[in-house]
Amino acid sequence: MNENLFASFATPTMVGLPIVILIIMFPSILFPSPNRLINNRLISIQQWLVQLTSKQMMAIHNSKGQTWTLMLMSLILFIGSTNLLGLLPHSFTPTTQLSMNLGMAIPLWAGTVFMGFRHKTKAALAHFLPQGTPIFLIPMLVIIETISLFIQPVALAVRLTANITAGHLLMHLIGGATLALMSISPSTALITFIILILLTILEFAVAMIQAYVFTLLVSLYLHDNT
């Protein structure tokens, strides 16, 4: 119980060197390239899920937006597998680091905005000034719309960080309370343990939902700019 509550969010090191790069690369092992003519059940399920997600997410895009399919599918698989691996005991979740999430959100957001200004310049500039705006409100609305545009990647990264971090902290607190109550009140400890099991199941769902939400918002930003 004396362990620092945020110790599990510290970047792990080996021989004094951070190994976060190895941790980030680890999810790629979960999706191996098939080397046989007939896929096994696991690979077939993975391919079916990827195809289903890509159809739902990319249905709203035109031909220019469709070129982002591979990137968006890689993004949702990476975030989802990273979140799920972070639920394992004594593991590290890179998506609890705001710096990493910003590193994903800013380039993707910047790419969508760049495409908008390149292919739909007039429409992209029109977003800064809604139609029918009174003349005396034009300067204020331009500033507000500019701020709302630049805050999109920050909100994207903070949303993912906050949801994953909150779940891990809650599991840590309930797990610590369960251990402390085992010697004091076993019946109460059993109740908290059941709550912990239910929360863990919920966190598995949250891990996948947050990966989908992050990728879906990037997809919507792309749709607005293509």
UniProtKB/Swiss-Prot annotation:
Q: Which GO terms describe its cellular component?
A: mitochondrial inner membrane; proton-transporting ATP synthase complex
**What superkingdom heads the lineage?**
Eukaryota
Q: Which residues form a coiled coil?
A: none
Pfam entry (one): ATP-synt_A
What biological-process GO terms show up in the record? proton motive force-driven ATP synthesis; proton motive force-driven mitochondrial ATP synthesis; proton transmembrane transport
Please tell me whether the keyword Mitochondrion is annotated for this protein: yes
Q: What is its main location?
A: mitochondrion
The molecular function terms of the Gene Ontology recorded here are: proton channel activity; proton-transporting ATP synthase activity, rotational mechanism
Which InterPro entries has this protein been placed in? ATP_synth_F0_asu (IPR000568), ATP_synth_F0_asu_AS (IPR023011), ATP_synth_F0_asu_bact/mt (IPR045083), F0_ATP_A_sf (IPR035908)
| Keyword Transmembrane helix found | yes
Localization, per the record, is: Mitochondrion inner membrane
Q: Into which family does the record put it?
A: Belongs to the ATPase A chain family.
Protein name according to UniProt:
ATP synthase F(0) complex subunit a
Q: Which organism is it from?
A: Equus caballus (Horse)
- Gene designation: MT-ATP6
